[in-house]
A protein has these predicted regions:
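Hydrophobic alpha-helical membrane segments
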Residues: 71-92
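Alpha-helical transmembrane segments
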Residues: 33-46, 107
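Membrane-water interface at the C-terminal end of transmembrane alpha helices
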Residues: 21-24, 110-131
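Alpha-helical transmembrane segments and their membrane-interface exit regions
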Residues: 45-50, 106-116
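Cytosolic juxtamembrane helix and N-cap/initiation of the first transmembrane helix
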Residues: 1-19, 29-39
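Membrane-helix boundary connector in multi-pass membrane proteins
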Residues: 85-107, 115
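N-terminal signal-anchor/start-transfer transmembrane helix
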Residues: 14-24, 43-60
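Short juxtamembrane and helix-loop transition motifs at transmembrane-helix boundaries
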Residues: 1-2, 34-36, 60-71
Length: 131
């Protein structure tokens, strides 16, 4: 079996914010953890918007119209939530509250890097080099 460096690079980049949050759970706490609250709140807002636009809005439309015919897809703010959460994790290293909230936001942010990897994993044109 041949190692696919594109997939290894994709896993490394897309899950680095998750690894940072897990590392932050075990790191010693800094006194400046409060500086992470603003980027974390902004990242949570963007993540919530992405979750709403990806899952909740189509579900509500389907309930009202009994199908998705005529539904207009609306894009959220991809990657911005992940960047804000990463900044929050860097500012609040060692804070278990910031790390746990960051993991939660990374989970719900469907426009973030981890979700990009999950959604595109089966796309051979993206991850496999041309033969």
């Amino acid at each position: 079996m041949r190692l696919n460096f594109r997939r290894v690079l994709g896993i490394t980049i897309c899950f680095s914010p998750v690894a940072l949050a897990v590392w932050s759970l075990f790191a010693p706490r800094r006194p400046t953890w409060w500086a992470a609250l603003i980027p974390l709140a902004l990242g949570a807002s963007i993540g919530s918007l992405n979750l709403y636009l990806s899952w909740i809005r189509p579900w509500i439309y389907r309930l009202r119209n009994h199908s998705l015919e005529g539904y207009r897809h609306a894009s959220g703010a991809p990657v911005i939530g992940t960047v804000l959460v990463t900044l929050a994790l860097l500012a609040g290293v060692g804070s278990k509250l910031i790390a746990a909230a960051g993991l939660l936001v990374l989970t719900i942010d469907t426009g973030g890097l981890p979700w990009f990897l999950v959604q595109t994993w089966g796309d051979k044109s993206l991850w496999n080099p041309a033969a």
